[in-house]
């Protein structure tokens, strides 16, 4: 029995790469639709690539939301976010795309997506998008 070559040069994607490539946001039923509550999710290792230089951009994403009938499943959200790591896309476009996908997946009562990009060349950027009415 031979040991598998971990550094095989074939172009066959590894299992983690396949999971990321096939990822989509999965939701499950809100366990308490009658209660108003807020969920916060932090994704501290977001990456994508600058569409002009190809250099990696790093950010911390924060999602704050008040669920409607669905809540986000965290593992699927992690895999979905990871699929942007090799994509050449602007900060503004990627954050708006993520917000659109979050809205389409769960249609929360209210949601706030915050992206805090690491400084590059002495410039940092924060981007906030809101949708819906926050309930009290």
Curated annotation (Swiss-Prot):
Residues that coordinate or bind substrate: 72-74, 91-92
Protein's name according to its UniProt entry: NADPH-dependent 7-cyano-7-deazaguanine reductase
EC code: 1.7.1.13
Family assignment from sequence similarity: Belongs to the GTP cyclohydrolase I family. QueF type 1 subfamily.
InterPro entries named among the record's database cross-references: GTP-CH-I_C/QueF (IPR043133), NADPH_dep_7-cyano-7-deazaG_red (IPR050084), QueF (IPR029500), QueF_type1 (IPR016856)
Top-level class of the enzyme under EC nomenclature: oxidoreductase
Function: Catalyzes the NADPH-dependent reduction of 7-cyano-7-deazaguanine (preQ0) to 7-aminomethyl-7-deazaguanine (preQ1).
Organism this protein belongs to: Prochlorococcus marinus (strain MIT 9515)
Subcellular location: Cytoplasm
GO annotation (BP), single: tRNA modification
Any one Pfam family match given in the protein's UniProt record, by short name: QueF
Associated pathway: tRNA modification; tRNA-queuosine biosynthesis
Active-site residue numbers: 50 (thioimide intermediate), 57 (proton donor)
GO cellular component, one term: cytoplasm
Alphabetized GO MF terms: preQ1 synthase activity
Reaction equations catalysed: 7-aminomethyl-7-carbaguanine + 2 NADP(+) = 7-cyano-7-deazaguanine + 2 NADPH + 3 H(+)
Domain of life, per lineage: Bacteria
UniProt KW keywords: Cytoplasm, NADP, Oxidoreductase, Queuosine biosynthesis
PANTHER family in the record: NADPH-DEPENDENT 7-CYANO-7-DEAZAGUANINE REDUCTASE
């Amino acid at each position: 029995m031979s040991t598998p070559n971990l550094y095989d040069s074939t172009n066959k994607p590894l299992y983690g790469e396949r999971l990321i490539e096939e990822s989509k946001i999965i939701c499950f039923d809100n366990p308490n639709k009658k209660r108003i509550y807020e969920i916060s999710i932090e994704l501290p290792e977001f990456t994508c690539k600058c569409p002009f230089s190809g250099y990696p951009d790093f950010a911390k994403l924060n999602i704050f939301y008040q669920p409607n009938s669905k809540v986000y499943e965290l593992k699927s959200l992690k895999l979905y976010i990871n699929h942007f790591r090799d994509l050449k896309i602007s900060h503004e476009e990627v954050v708006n795309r993520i917000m659109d996908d979050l809205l389409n997946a769960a249609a929360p009562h209210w949601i706030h997506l915050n992206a805090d990009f690491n400084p590059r060349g002495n410039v940092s950027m924060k981007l906030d998008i809101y949708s819906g009415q926050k309930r009290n």
